[in-house]
Regions:
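Amphipathic alpha-helical polymerization modules
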Residues: 1-163
Length: 163
């Protein structure tokens, strides 16, 4: 028997990270919609490009050495028990639009939410396929599987404090 068959595929771990990231980003984007009338409000987002680069590097490392290694960055930190903390960043483009063209600002936020939702749905479907989960499994079931016992450990203290 091939010993590699006993090692779980790291694709599932990457998909779980994507699902967690998209949930955290959804919260931030919702704040951007709900707090537009707050004086001095600064729209934020999660560092999407940075997160994609971290995942690309982890997958490249996996292909080279058969181990999945997530490296911390200035705004993304990986911890024990599969946790990650992400520092939201100010969204200067959104801030500018909020000041000059509120309709464009709202459209930007809605488009980001739609893109984020699509990314989440794709990752969930791939995870279902990867893990052999039955097609009838609901999003709630996936969320329970992904979040574990303490989903708040997947966000940064800065993100939690902002909510």
């Amino acid at each position: 028997m091939d010993a590699r068959l006993l090692i779980p595929d790291n694709v599932s771990e990457v998909l779980v990270k994507i699902i967690r990231f998209t949930e955290l980003r959804r919260r931030i984007l919702h704040q951007n919609l709900h707090h537009v009338d707050q004086p001095g409000f600064t729209p934020r987002d999660l560092p999407v490009r940075e997160f994609a680069e971290v995942l690309s590097e982890a997958v490249a490392e996996h292909l080279r050495s058969h181990r999945l290694l997530f490296r911390d960055t200035a705004t993304i930190t990986f911890g024990p028990n599969n946790t990650m903390q992400i520092q939201p960043v100010a969204d200067s483009r959104a801030r500018s639009l909020l000041r000059t063209d509120r309709d464009e600002y709202m459209e930007l936020q809605v488009n980001k939410l739609l893109e984020n939702s699509l990314n989440r749905k794709i990752a969930q479907e791939l995870l279902r396929h990867q893990c052999g989960v039955c097609p009838g499994m609901t999003d709630g079931d996936i969320n329970e599987t992904v979040a574990g016992d303490n989903s708040s450990t997947d966000s940064s203290p800065h993100l939690d404090a902002a909510e």
